[in-house]
Amino acid sequence: MADSKQSNRDWAADDVDADELPPTTESTDANGITTIVSWKYNADDQKVKVTRRVRRRLQVSTVTQTMAERKQWPKFGLDKGKPPGPDRKTTIIGENLHFKIAPISKIQRVEPEPETAVKAPTGKAVVCRLCSGQHYTARCPFREQLAAIDNLNADGAEEEQVVVSGTLAAKGAGETGGKYVPPSQRAGATGAGDSMFRARDELPTLRVTSLSIDAEEDDLRALFQPFAKNGKLGRANIVRDRNTRVSKGLAFVSFESKRDAEAAMAHLNGRGYDSLILEVAWSQPRGERT
């Protein structure tokens, strides 16, 4: 009876051992090639023998101290207790990607996607009055730059001189009748009040015509900057079309020193620039043009 129980127990143990996979074995031959034999189950639940031959070579690399310390950390999780190095059962070895930081100047700027057309409540497309973009004028990103030269594009790109007539000045000498009267029109006033643009109007300004439409403000400054020896170069603006922003071949350049402006006019007037002959002359107020 005891022999029968012992035989039954051995039969069950043999059945359990038959379902287990044999252990993985490794062997190295005289040529240094390691043969790794492992077992696995395929899709049909059959045992499959996998043989891999690997040639191992010692490769020495220099790493930082912190990286060397991380390699000494004990493994955890599914790799706990396993030898150093990646285990193919739990680790996917990919391609090494080398990260290189490029200078900011060499990074290509990503072109912004074209804005979708903004429509007004009436259903019409909204067009900016400054840059003709499809957005409201109040939200134009170039509002400050374009608004600063709107007066130049109006008619000749110069400010008008405000002249107060004698009758208007005399009118302010009487009774105001409870209404606000500007200081320039009050009793005892000699003329117009101070203007914010007085310092700008008093600068010696040159009018440049026959300018290439491809020239930019930076090119204009580079052309006139060498003559600014007694003072700084003031404004250098190119008159552009209000809608297309294309140059009209007209520009205005101001100097702090009249002597510098005269030298620039004498040297550049009639000079060839970008296949055109420049015409440089004094800029005259709108009322004095001929």
Swiss-Prot record:
The keyword Translocase does not apply. Belongs to the eIF-3 subunit G family. Residues 1-12 have a biased composition (Basic and acidic residues). Residues 1-30, 173-192 are annotated as: Disordered. It comes from Cryptococcus neoformans var. neoformans serotype D (strain JEC21 / ATCC MYA-565). Residues 204-285 form the RRM domain. InterPro entries: eIF3_g, eIF3g_N, eIF3G_RRM, Nucleotide-bd_a/b_plait_sf, RBD_domain_sf, RRM_dom. Coiled coil: none annotated. GO terms for molecular function: RNA binding; translation initiation factor activity. Keywords: Cytoplasm, Initiation factor, Protein biosynthesis, RNA-binding. The lineage of its organism: Eukaryota, Fungi, Dikarya, Basidiomycota, Agaricomycotina. Component of the eukaryotic translation initiation factor 3 (eIF-3) complex. It holds the Pfam family eIF3g. GO terms for cellular component: eukaryotic 43S preinitiation complex; eukaryotic 48S preinitiation complex; eukaryotic translation initiation factor 3 complex, eIF3e; eukaryotic translation initiation factor 3 complex, eIF3m; multi-eIF complex. GO terms for biological process: formation of cytoplasmic translation initiation complex; translation reinitiation; translational termination. It comes from the Eukaryota. This is Eukaryotic translation initiation factor 3 subunit G. RNA-binding component of the eukaryotic translation initiation factor 3 (eIF-3) complex, which is involved in protein synthesis of a specialized repertoire of mRNAs and, together with other initiation factors, stimulates binding of mRNA and methionyl-tRNAi to the 40S ribosome. The eIF-3 complex specifically targets and initiates translation of a subset of mRNAs involved in cell proliferation. This subunit can bind 18S rRNA. It is found in: Cytoplasm. The gene is TIF35. Its main location: cytoplasm.
